[in-house]
Every structure is written in structure tokens, then in C-alpha cells.
UniProtKB/Swiss-Prot annotation:
This is Neuromedin-U-25. The gene is NMU. Keywords: Amidation, Hormone, Secreted. One of its GO terms (biological process) is regulation of smooth muscle contraction. PROSITE patterns: NMU (PS00967). Its main location: secreted. It comes from the Eukaryota. The keyword Cell membrane does not apply. Stimulates uterine smooth muscle contraction and causes selective vasoconstriction. It is found in: Secreted. Belongs to the NmU family. It comes from Gallus gallus (Chicken). GO terms for molecular function: hormone activity. The modification Asparagine amide is found at residue 25.
Length: 25
């Protein structure tokens, strides 16, 4: 699980990225 890749991908942000990085959008 790479942060950079998920950060760019909406799917990663909504699933796991959300916990690590709360999207401002």
C-alpha cells in the first residue's frame, strides 16, 4: 500500500487514505 499512489487515486483516499489523510475536497 503506497501512500503516493493512493493519494493520487480517489479510491485509495476514500477507502484507506481517508484514515491517514483526510481529503479537503
Amino acid at each position: 500500500y503506497k501512500v503516493d499512489e493512493d493519494l493520487q487515486g480517489a479510491g485509495g483516499i476514500q477507502s484507506r487514505g481517508y484514515f491517514f489523510f483526510r481529503p479537503r475536497n
